[in-house]
UniProtKB/Swiss-Prot annotation:
Reaction catalyzed: 2 oxidized [2Fe-2S]-[ferredoxin] + pyruvate + CoA = 2 reduced [2Fe-2S]-[ferredoxin] + acetyl-CoA + CO2 + H(+); 3-methyl-2-oxobutanoate + 2 oxidized [2Fe-2S]-[ferredoxin] + CoA = 2-methylpropanoyl-CoA + 2 reduced [2Fe-2S]-[ferredoxin] + CO2 + H(+)
Molecular function GO labels: 3-methyl-2-oxobutanoate dehydrogenase (ferredoxin) activity; pyruvate synthase activity
Name of the protein this chain belongs to: Pyruvate/ketoisovalerate oxidoreductases common subunit gamma
Keywords: Oxidoreductase
Species assigned in the record: Pyrococcus horikoshii (strain ATCC 700860 / DSM 12428 / JCM 9974 / NBRC 100139 / OT-3)
């Protein structure tokens, strides 16, 4: 089973990203589970969401404490949240940032096996006109992990958002897929 933990802020779409990733994996015939963790969050407060993907039915119902993959939608969270808490030894960290690999590694408490960086904010602003990075970051997830193919991500996005909004969000994911930089750490 692959366990993914998303870190974002309220209103950024971390929960939607977790759900779309699950939908993309489901489209490929996998078993999935996606759910948010809500405390007293409000818009702008840190939010966590989770996705599990497996080849067999998923029976566990807990939060993800030891993720295989961590996805960070808002790089400012690196200053206040230990996003790598519990990350498995072979873990992958995917971050929306314009910063360099070295700048990001300085901020991580635990070094991942693989680090993927993409400026999803700029992609979202150029494609959608809004700094909502949830669909763009899924392109980076597809590229860095190989868990799902980009076509399944695009279809899941279009199933979630209809019409022009779906097309633009799918375009953002594809662009992020193409622009994601991956580093073995």
């Amino acid at each position: 089973m692959i366990e993914i933990r998303f870190h974002g802020r309220g209103g950024q779409g971390a929960v939607t990203a977790a759900n779309i990733l699950a939908e993309a994996a489901f489209l490929e015939g996998k078993y999935v589970q996606a759910f948010p963790f809500f405390g007293v969050e409000r818009r702008g407060a840190p939010v966590t969401a989770f996705t599990r993907i497996d080849e067999k039915p998923i029976r566990i119902k807990t939060q993800i404490y030891e993720p295989d993959i961590v996805v960070v939608l808002d790089p400012s969270l690196l200053e206040t949240v230990d996003v790598t808490a519990g990350l498995k030894e072979e873990g992958i960290v995917i971050i929306n940032t314009e910063k360099s690999k070295d700048e990001i590694l300085e901020k991580l408490k635990k070094k991942p096996k693989k680090l993927a960086l993409v400026d999803a904010t700029t992609i979202a602003l150029e494609t959608l006109g809004l700094p909502i990075t949830n669909t763009a970051i899924l392109g980076a997830v597809a590229k860095a992990t190989g868990l799902v193919n980009i076509e399944s991500v695009e279809k899941a996005i279009k199933d979630t958002f209809s019409g022009e909004l779906g097309e633009k969000n799918a375009k953002a994911a594809r662009e992020a897929f193409e622009k994601t930089e991956i580093f073995e750490v």
